Design a protein with these regions (language model features):
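A short acidic-Thr-Gly-centered motif at the start of a beta-strand
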Residues: 86-89, 199-202, 330-334
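A general structural motif
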Residues: 92-94, 119, 204-206
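Phosphate/oxyanion-binding loops and surfaces in catalytic or ligand/nucleic-acid-binding neighborhoods
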Residues: 2, 6, 33-36, 122, ...
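Conserved interdomain hinge at the start of the Helicase C-terminal
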Residues: 190-205
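Conserved helicase motor core of SF1/SF2 NTP-dependent helicases
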Residues: 102-188, 208-226, 232-242, 333-338, ...
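Core RecA-like ATPase module of SF1/SF2 helicases and allied nucleic-acid translocases
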Residues: 161-164, 214-362
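Accessory N-terminal region flanking or inserted into the helicase ATPase core
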Residues: 6-97, 106-111, 124, 134
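Conserved P-loop NTPase-based nucleic-acid remodeling module centered on helicase motor cores
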Residues: 1-24, 225-228, 232-239
Length: 362
């Protein structure tokens, strides 16, 4: 049956710690209710959603989704967890380790308990001060309520002193938290504030740029692109990488280095018929090596110009960007110096220089 209600459905997002991601509030309400172990109407009544969805419309979606899953014998990831708990068929282990435990939902805590009830020793690692997934159903209170022997790690080997100071000032405002003291590493570090992202000099060093949401990264991409700085967006494929490789292959070919069929095909993809006879690719031996002189003698290759002139079928915007990066001394054969990510998407990461956008608008 069709309800004629539009749902924006996304798959499980591996870049966001494997969390279920959807822009549909109806689906998010249903998912959060299952993670929290509460009824869907209870989650709806919390009014934590942002879209205008009536209770009647929500119930229709919820009932129809259940009917559809039952009709086609379908389950989702959270259903797997609840079915596992009901089955009481956890294997017996000598030792179980649970990491990042502050991010577990109540349903996941129930699953963990069903496992450790049949385990000799269980080690739970986590930090309630790092709990940033409440919005996704994380039950931090269950982490805080755990009993047993506590081993506190009092020395950080990652956090410099100035970052430690501001972090302690912030966590001190959290009402329900486990009291803890820890020491920063010996380096003082540097903490600076800027009015605009463009004011930050990122021409040297490795950088991690963090924003609240993905759409906030798009404007940063444009700014870094215009400056000719080598960067990557963690949530996008680097579309320039193939072109970088073709450029290196072309420059090697001009220097007299042999290249293979795959390299020639890549180069040809950025040339028009004026510079490369595309039909000739089918005559190339895929196991042989080729030099520029041989390709030109056969009239397959018709140019020996510098890459940005020879690659006449490559997007001009990409060509200008790569030329500017090279002028800036960027090492395009290495990984990008600058990584753009969301705060949630980079949890556990580190870098020499970190930029945090304090605009937390949704």
């Amino acid at each position: 049956r069709k309800l004629k209600i539009k749902l924006d459905y996304h798959e499980y997002d591996n870049n966001e710690s494997g969390l279920f991601s959807t822009n549909s509030d109806a689906l998010r309400i249903i998912q959060l209710a299952k993670l929290k172990g509460i009824k869907p109407e209870e989650q709806y009544n919390l009014q934590q959603h942002t879209q205008d969805i009536t209770e009647t419309e929500f119930r229709r979606i919820y009932n129809e989704l259940n009917r559809y899953k039952k009709e086609f014998n379908l389950i989702d990831f959270t259903d797997m967890i609840t079915e596992f708990i009901k089955s009481d068929k956890s294997p017996n282990f000598d030792v179980v380790f649970i990491d990042e435990a502050q991010d577990l939902s109540r349903t996941q805590w129930n699953m963990a308990k069903s496992i450790w009830d049949k385990t000799k020793d269980t080690y739970i690692a986590g930090d309630d001060d790092q709990a940033i997934f409440r919005w996704a159903g994380a039950d931090v209170d269950s982490f805080i309520a755990q009993t047993g022997r506590v081993m506190k790690l009092a020395q950080s080997y990652r956090i410099p002193q100035v970052v430690h100071d501001i972090a302690m000032n912030i966590v001190g405002r959290i009402k329900n938290r486990l009291p803890k003291e820890w020491r920063p590493k010996m380096q003082k570090g540097l903490l600076s504030y800027h009015q605009e992202f463009k004011d930050i000099n990122m021409r040297e060093g490795n950088w991690l740029v963090l924003a609240r949401t993905r759409f906030m990264l798009e404007d940063l991409e444009k700014q870094l692109h215009s400056q000719g700085l080598y960067f990557e967006n963690k949530f996008k494929t680097n579309k320039e990488q193939d072109l970088y490789t073709a450029i290196n292959d072309w420059e090697n070919l001009r220097k007299g280095v042999d290249i293979n069929y795959e390299q020639i095909s890549r180069i040809a993809s950025y040339m028009s018929q004026n510079n490369f006879e595309k039909n000739s690719l089918k005559y190339l031996d895929k196991d042989a090596g080729y030099q520029m002189s041989g390709l030109k003698e056969r009239m397959w290759l018709k140019t020996d110009k510098v890459w940005y002139e020879a690659f006449d079928d490559a997007p001009q915007k990409k060509i200008r960007y790569i030329r500017r990066m090279r002028e800036n001394g960027e090492k395009l054969n290495s990984s990008p110096r600058i990584t753009l990510s969301t705060i949630h998407g980079v949890k556990g990461g580190e870098q020499d220089n970190v930029v945090l956008l304090t605009d937390l608008s949704r």
